[in-house]
Amino acid sequence: LHSTSRRQRQMCIRDRLDNDEKRRIIDAFVIHNFKKNQMIYAEGEEPEYLWCLLQGKVKKFKDGVGGRVQILRLIRSVQYFGYRAYFAKEPYNSSAAAFEPSIVGTLPMTLVEDMINKNPKLAWFFIHELSRNLGGSDTKIVNLTQKHIRGRLAEALIVLRDHYGFEDDNMTLRIYMAREDLANLSNMTTSNAIRTLSGFVSERLITVDGRRICILNEPMLRKISKFG
């Protein structure tokens, strides 16, 4: 469970463990490979594992009314997910799937719980992560319910930029999303997402080539996102 950036170091549990705990994790850690769009876990299943994304991209989503899907959160490398339901003693209330071919590690939550009971530093790590996620969820609810379509799509593009960054050209988002996924992230129909993207292209805020999106005017996108 190595990390490279400052944020990744903050998210890594390794630094909060003693040598015996590290050995227990190494012995129990299992690596899984997921294909593009493959389900990792489904809403209603019982939570058994702590999931850690090692490589690739993962989305957490929930099926809504009329077959609509809402993407709740994007997972990036060296980020843990899927543990809230276990702590709440309830089934998963959302699903997770791979955006692209991804490598994910698992630890039994029974092991994690045992270590938390004996290690306050590890307990505080999960308290911190749950608190951050709750704050992010509150912000997302406000954004999705109060912003207009342009503001919601601009917000989605900024989230993708902040989560995954750019390719080497410093313009192309390092994630290639279907229009449907972009719409599900922005709480709008696919047709509205396509029209709004076209509007951003006309305003020279972005360029679009298939699923490749290049951000040409990030300050203006952030302004649109901020003021909705």
What is each PLM-predicted segment?
Residues 99, 117-187:
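Polybasic "coupling" helices that flank or enter modular domains
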Residues 1-5, 9, 13:
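Single conserved hydrophobic/aromatic residue that forms the stacking wall/gate
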